[in-house]
Amino acid sequence: MVDAITEFVVGKIDNYLIEEAPMLIGVKDDLEELKTELTCIQVYLKNVEVCDKEDEVSKEWTKLVLDIAYDVEDVLDTYFLKLEKRLHRLGLMRLTNIISDKKDAYNILDDIKTLKRRTLDVTRKLEMYGIGNFNEHRVVASTSRVREVRRARSDDQEERVVGLTDDAKVLLTKLLDDDGDNKIYMISIFGMEGLGKTSLARKLFNSSDVKESFEYRVWTNVSGECNTRDILMRIISSLEETSEGELEKMAQQELEVYLHDILQEKRYLVVVDDIWESEALESLKRALPCSYQGSRVIITTSIRVVAEGRDKRVYTHNIRFLTFKESWNLFEKKAFRYILKVDQELQKIGKEMVQKCGGLPRTTVVLAGLMSRKKPNEWNDVWSSLRVKDDNIHVSSLFDLSFKDMGHELKLCFLYLSVFPEDYEVDVEKLIQLLVAEGFIQEDEEMTMEDVARYYIEDLVYISLVEVVKRKKGKLMSFRIHDLVREFTIKKSKELNFVNVYDEQHSSTTSRREVVHHLMDDNYLCDRRVNTQMRSFLFFGKRRNDITYVETITLKLKLLRVLNLGGLHFICQGYSPWSLPDVIGGLVHLRYLGIADTVVNNLPDFISNLRFLQTLDASGNSFERMTDLSNLTSLRHLTGRFIGELLIGDAVNLQTLRSISSYSWSKLKHELLINLRDLEIYEFHILNDQIKVPLDLVSLSKLKNLRVLKIEVVSFSLFSEETVRFELLVKLTLHCDVRRLPRDMDLIFPSLESLTLVTNLQEDPMPTLQKLQRLENLVLYSCVYPGAKMFINAQGFGRLRKLKVIIKRLDELEIEEEAMPCLMKLNLDNKDGATKLMIPDRMRAFV
């Protein structure tokens, strides 16, 4: 992994040499030499890792290289921080002015020469201790293959609940049993790690039958640091909006009573994943009412004494191991997918490896993912390396081999997963923005950095290191990290000072990134030495906080690239509530600022100082004042409700803009927004003095890369005198006063896959809409017109899968027999039977 970090730093030197050349006065040659030395060391680093050199000399040598790499990054970033501050004071534009005062240049020159000496010393140690001699037989690591992942994207890679079909049927019956047998109200799923307890519980939780049967459904995970009070508070918070401060004041017994009162007389399902303590289980029994409403509780546990209590109301379900046949079927589907000819020798090696997986699904799928990337002539080498370590294959060994098999960018992406909380549903778009902001992703000739990052994440899915939660149209939307994988990434990240997950027991850290889950209070700052070289600080959770905590942290962290404070509420005496601390304006290296759901209601002027900012995530917040972001030319993603005027300069890099008023939109230079992909425009009625500007298709059609468009305004027309075409638009949502649809909508929107219309149509839209060849999802809502009749002919909607029609006074809906052959869901608002339905029998089951 040290080679990945070193390669990352070498890439950073390259970026500085290319983009900041005018600022590197007198140091360019020395920096080039340093880069060359580090590049040469790369070869030895890779060999040390691939050959599994674990002797003390090799470990110490790699640590020296890691320290140098981090120090190089510190020297460069600190130097440019000083230059930025000086230019800001002088009021100069950085790229057009060369500093005449060479004081800082001399300082960095001394630092670089020191680093060069240290690098040469490390190189000499290679020869002195023979670290560079690698003649023994070894497994050759493959590089990450970004484009090869494309071939796997068409396949759904969600984790299969292998061998658990019968288990799921049995437990589903017990969940839905309404025959008055209320003796069983808690199901305990028991088994060792890697058997699929969580997968089985989640399959039950997400079952359509379960969703329909239970009024309330709650899923909570018991993390390592979680106590019984935390479990109770999480369940309560999932059920109702309750102040966290109020809950914290309650004793455990009071929380039990409070939760009991909430759920009394309710039909609920509560799942508590990975419970370890009998005391916590007894508390849940007291808090969760066992009533006659058919409510159920599911727990998963690896602790037998927790699973097998004496309570007759608890049904314990033991998960079995996979049979060899089940394990082999699971393995060969993935491992042999791209091998054209599987000979007997390859099958023999594969079966020997599968036999050693011990019937554990997790171990088997990770092994299959690893072998799917290997050429047939490499299989024996992998099997030999696994047998050397142990008679049995442990999943941690497979994680290690998979990790070594990755290219350096994929390694960085994989280890970065350690920032997310346990059982967290990772939003792929957010992760992509974070990876780009960290500088881990390089632009490709054919793809944006975001597209490259997405392929890396798909690669992690392909090799079974993450578990898919949601896809839309094959596009990965979210995933989860298995506990064992998360433990591996946290351990590796800590070893490399890459990421530190805050623990109350440790008061300081030397890691480049720190993440805080749930807690940020006096304990966090008390006697804590903050690492001033930190590049990222991320907070996950929801908490009302004194603004001074954030000020204290950010005041010391001048080199931050990523600052995620989503969920914090900034409150402090002497400050107006709901504002950001001024010290954030001094973080000139910042690429990602996350302030989602922080109740911030204005963006201070200092935001314009953050001119390298790529992502500003302010979703969940509304800004009524004018917001000037015209200096942020690197901005790629902007989210928040910008009610007041929003000023954006020549934002050619902007890809996401959600959401902007129609007035502000009219003031922008649309022709410059060449990379905009996702756009939301609203008409905010809160500002009476704001001029309402009608929207038209012409201005929007200039956005040649637009994929997603949402418009919520009164005055909007789909008609245009000019010929317009939205070649790449796949999703369109219109909430406006549209009376008619243009007959050539299929020509205007040739790629449209999802359409939502909340309008006041005066005629049947189906003759027009059914010509949209790629449409798969259609929602018509609140469309009122007299004598309303709709007709879909036999050739209509060839690809439509979901149709939802919520129309007042719809008199008649006729669908011909052969129409919509792909339809899977039909939702009609016809409970009172007022609409005459003339539809095929096959569709009546959907209604």
Swiss-Prot record:
Keyword annotations from UniProtKB, A to Z: ATP-binding, Coiled coil, Leucine-rich repeat, Nucleotide-binding, Plant defense, Repeat
What is one Gene Ontology biological process annotated in the Swiss-Prot or TrEMBL record?
response to other organism
Q: Which residues form a coiled coil?
A: 26-42
Q: Which residues bind ATP?
A: 191-198
**Entry-linked CDD domains:** RX-CC_like (cd14798)
Outline the extent of the NB-ARC domain: 142-446
Molecular function GO labels: ADP binding; ATP binding
Q: Where are the LRR repeats?
A: 587-610, 612-634, 703-726, 749-774, 807-830
Q: What is known of its domains?
A: The LRR repeats probably act as specificity determinant of pathogen recognition.
Described by its record, this protein's role is as follows: Potential disease resistance protein.
Family statement drawn from the similarity comment of this UniProt entry: Belongs to the disease resistance NB-LRR family. RPP13 subfamily.
What is the protein named? Answer: Putative disease resistance RPP13-like protein 2
Task: Record the organism.
Answer: Arabidopsis thaliana (Mouse-ear cress)
